[in-house]
Regions:
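Glycine-rich, proline-tolerant flexible connector loops at the mouths of alpha/beta enzymes
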Residues: 63-86
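Mobile, glycine- and charge-enriched loop segments
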Residues: 22-42, 78, 82-95
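Structural preference for beta-strand elements that scaffold enzyme active sites
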Residues: 32-39, 61-63, 89-94, 120-121, ...
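Active-site acidic/histidine proton-transfer and metal-coordination neighborhood
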Residues: 4-12, 27, 48-51, 68, ...
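A conditional alpha-helix N-cap/helix-loop micro-motif detector
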Residues: 43, 74, 103-104, 127, ...
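Histidine-acidic metal/acid-base catalytic patches
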Residues: 1-34, 43-57, 162, 166-177, ...
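Conserved residues at the C-terminal ends of beta-strands
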Residues: 65, 98, 125, 206, ...
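Short active-site-proximal "capping" loops at secondary-structure junctions
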Residues: 42, 66-72, 100, 252
Length: 280
């Protein structure tokens, strides 16, 4: 069977997916985009609390960080997580950010975990000496590596740093563009999306007040993020149906009422931007 994902389709190209899926209302709200959350945003909650809050926010896609879902060989633990998510019709869109080095066996443990958990995208910070290993692993498991930029001073600070790193490697080694960190690196997030193109498998929707290393996070669109422009660019490059499109809001993790209110504001702005992009 050829799935929407394997055919390179996008949610907004395939109305039958929307009609058949329990995620219909959420997908329609966000213009057909599979918007979810990076669970690091909810690190002030335990894993069960993070899942519950994600559900209450009306989101069906979650990108876990290891603090909520540690990498494990234990199938029982993975199955327990799967059951929790299945009850809410939720999907793990990605896991990370995970480090990779030259140790192939250690790298493979992450892929084995991802395969067990049904995770298609691994957000990653791979060392330069990891790429030969990763070429073999993405081919063996058919799971993507999405290189995450961490802002000024990091390995993949600028757009060109990432593009140079993946040159000549398996196309399943691509990118998770943290748009907030690109703002800190004085890069234009919309240009980032266009340049990374069909190797873009993940997005961290994030905004910062200033284009410099030390700054603070703000509600989407209140800093330097052109929210409608981001979604127009994602439509242009045909962001994949099984990619990870995650809101990441890092402020006030332990002030739960403020955190959830701010996340709600970000999601409302994202929905508005996504619908504007859909309308052209």
């Amino acid at each position: 069977m050829v799935t929407a994902a394997s055919a390179g389709a996008t949610w907004f190209d395939i109305p039958e997916i929307l009609a058949a899926s329990g995620k219909n209302a959420s997908l329609n709200k966000y213009g057909g985009f599979p918007i979810g959350i990076q669970s690091y945003s909810l690190r002030g909650f335990g894993v069960d609390g993070a899942i519950e809050q994600t559900h209450k926010l009306g989101l069906y896609f979650i990108e876990f960080f290891s603090g909520h879902f540690p990498i494990t060989k234990d199938k029982i633990k993975v199955d327990e997580m799967t059951k929790k998510l299945d009850k809410r019709d939720m999907t793990i869109s990605a896991h990370g950010v995970n480090g990779f080095g030259a140790d192939h066996d250690k790298n493979e443990l992450v892929f084995q975990f991802a395969k067990m958990a049904g995770i298609k995208n691994i957000s990653a910070n791979p060392a330069p000496n990891s790429f030969d290993s990763l070429d073999k692993l993405v081919a063996k498991y058919d799971i993507r590596i999405s290189i995450h930029n961490h802002g000024p001073g990091a390995l993949y600070d600028k757009i060109e740093d990432g593009l140079k790193a993946v040159k000549g490697h398996d196309k399943r080694i691509g990118f998770c563009a943290d748009l907030g960190h690109y703002i800190r690196s004085n890069e234009d997030p919309v240009e980032v999306i266009h340049k990374l193109g069909d190797r873009l498998y993940g997005i961290h929707l994030k905004d910062f007040s200033e284009q410099k290393k030390r700054t603070h996070g703000v509600i989407l669109g209140k800093g330097h993020l052109d929210v409608p422009g981001v979604f127009k660019a994602l439509r242009k490059i045909k962001f994949p149906a099984d990619g990870a499109l995650s809101l990441e809001y890092e402020e006030t993790p332990n002030d739960h009422p403020k955190l959830l209110a701010d996340i709600g504001k970000c999601l409302a702005i994202a929905a508005d931007g996504a619908l504007k992009a859909k309308q052209g």
